[in-house]
């Protein structure tokens, strides 16, 4: 068995030299016990017994290649590396009938967006999507597959927003651009053929933060969203909860990433860590739209997102909370290489639509 696994390890290394995507898809086909053994051979020493075995293998490969964390001292280089990694795992995209890049002429400045429509001849609700990436990296291409899955399986239009990134812009500018994009959707609801003016916001990680901050700021405004989908959102820059210390090493999101994000998004712009502009858990939660909150069990952000969901419920907000215990931060971005991640993301898409329909 050891000889066989060593040979497979060498095969995986060869595939890695050619491209991360083929290697990852080969890993995903292995039985769980084989993945566990391979993770050990690759040197993954972190004790997370309940973590998905495929994720262990992928993290072992990342660490072996010296890629720990995704945000570093050079934001531009961090963006390049993140874009490269996401490009490396791409394969055939989920089919959506209409995908179009458009320009949004907003009061805060012109930005780009990508519009997905699974049935262009039908009126459908629209989901305004803000991508993750610590407010520093990411864009339309890095989250293209996620948006395609949301459009197809939630049966909604998706407008993915290419908002300006920190540290070049302040949180005030970034959030204003995202709120202006939501207002633009409402103002153009007839041209977009939005079913019964049904508009919601969604995002992963930093995008979840943006979604719920925008939702708070737009309460009682004409363009207030009807629902919010928050996928492992960051909502509290000030506090450090037990999950931060339990899962800050050997996983996708590290304590180093959190420190850099805090520096680029808060400290450099003199924003207090408990300002609701960046930490919505300290904001006014009254009259917030129904919230569908997703967490990953092995994630530094797990506890703050769970606490936020409790706060929403205590403030009378209709809320659904769902945890994926064996997953870590960023799992929805692994859909091109992980069947389980894709299954979970499809499940989230379908269940969110049911939740939205029930609470609209």
Identify the role of each PLM range.
Residues 1-115, 357-360:
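A glycine/proline-hinged amphipathic helix-loop "lid/cap" segment
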Residues 9-26, 98-114, 118-360:
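Alpha/beta-hydrolase superfamily serine-hydrolase fold, recognizing
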């Amino acid at each position: 068995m050891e000889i066989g696994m060593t040979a497979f390890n060498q095969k995986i290394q060869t595939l890695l030299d050619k491209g991360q995507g083929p290697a990852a898809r080969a890993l995903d086909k292995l039985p769980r016990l084989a993945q566990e053994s391979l993770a050990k051979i690759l040197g993954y020493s972190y004790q997370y017994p309940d973590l998905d075995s495929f994720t262990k293998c992928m993290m072992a490969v990342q660490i072996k290649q010296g890629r720990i964390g995704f945000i570093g001292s050079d934001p531009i280089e961090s963006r390049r590396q993140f874009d490269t990694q996401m490009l490396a795992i791409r394969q055939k995209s989920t089919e959506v009938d209409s995908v179009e890049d458009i320009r949004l002429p907003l009061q805060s400045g012109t930005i780009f967006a990508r519009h997905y429509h699974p049935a262009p001849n039908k009126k459908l609700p629209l989901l305004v999507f803000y991508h993750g990436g610590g407010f520093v990296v990411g864009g339309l291409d890095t989250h293209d597959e996620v948006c395609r899955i949301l459009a197809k399986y939630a049966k909604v239009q998706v407008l993915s927003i290419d908002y300006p990134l920190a540290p070049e812009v302040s949180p005030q500018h970034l959030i204003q651009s995202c709120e202006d994009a939501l207002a633009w959707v409402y103002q153009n609801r007839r041209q977009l053929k939005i079913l019964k003016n049904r508009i919601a916001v969604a995002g992963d990680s930093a995008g979840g933060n943006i979604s719920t901050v925008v939702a708070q700021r737009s309460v009682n405004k004409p363009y207030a969203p009807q629902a919010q989908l928050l996928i492992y959102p960051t909502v509290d820059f000030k506090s450090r909860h037990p999950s931060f210390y339990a899962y800050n090493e050997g996983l996708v999101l590290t304590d180093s990433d959190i420190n850099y994000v805090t520096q680029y998004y808060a400290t450099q712009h003199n924003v207090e860590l408990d300002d609701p502009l960046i930490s919505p858990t300290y904001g006014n939660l009254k009259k917030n739209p129904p919230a569908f909150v997703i967490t990953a069990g092995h994630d530094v952000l797990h506890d703050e997102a769970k606490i936020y969901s409790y706060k929403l419920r205590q403030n009378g907000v209709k809320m659904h909370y769902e945890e994926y215990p064996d997953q870590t931060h960023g799992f929805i971005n692994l859909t091109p290489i992980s069947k389980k991640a894709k299954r979970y993301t499809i499940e989230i898409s379908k269940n969110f639509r049911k939740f939205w329909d029930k609470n609209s």
